[in-house]
Amino acid sequence: QYVFQNIADGMATAIEIGLRKTSTKFFYTIWCDQIGLSSKTVKETIQYHEKSNFIASFPAARIKNNYTLVEKNKLNYLKKIYQSREEKLGKNSGLNDCGFFCCDTFFFKKNLKKLISSKKIVSKKTREHDFIYALNYFAKSYKIKKKITKNKIDTLGVNFKKDILKLKNIS
């Protein structure tokens, strides 16, 4: 079964619409531009998540010239994901997410729509309901875990021609 987001107002909204038709214990979402993500990383992250009690898990790799920068807390859980499209990243290198997220369906069905309605996850630049902002919000009170992958290509997303040139520099 397919669902459609009639108004392009962010990934959080797109995910929430999909959740209305989801009945599985877990759901998985991937950004459509994530051409570098390997099936091995997807499989390992799903297995990792399904054995955990985290509301969300995602793979991340250490790279230079990050698009996102993953910050962890003292217990190694997600503290925040910074996005270069929203703000200047303070570091040249660090953990970058891979655009793939494993999540607890019940938790997100219960909480994501309320968070969207509250307007707390509207991005400054795109004015869309941002799923990364939702993860950052939930990370303040719930366990979200990153799974390290050594495959830097897993982080590669292509939106523009210039992004293809990153293939040369990613290793």
Regions found by a protein language model. Give the residues of each.
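Conserved core of the sugar-phosphate nucleotidyltransferase
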Residues: 37-122, 129
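Conserved alpha/beta core of the MobA/IspD/sugar-nucleotide pyrophosphorylase nucleotidyltransferase superfamily
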Residues: 24, 94-171
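Conserved beta-strand termini and adjacent loop/short-helix elements that scaffold enzyme active sites
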Residues: 3-6, 59, 147-150
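Conserved N-terminal catalytic core of the sugar/cofactor nucleotidyltransferase
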Residues: 1-40
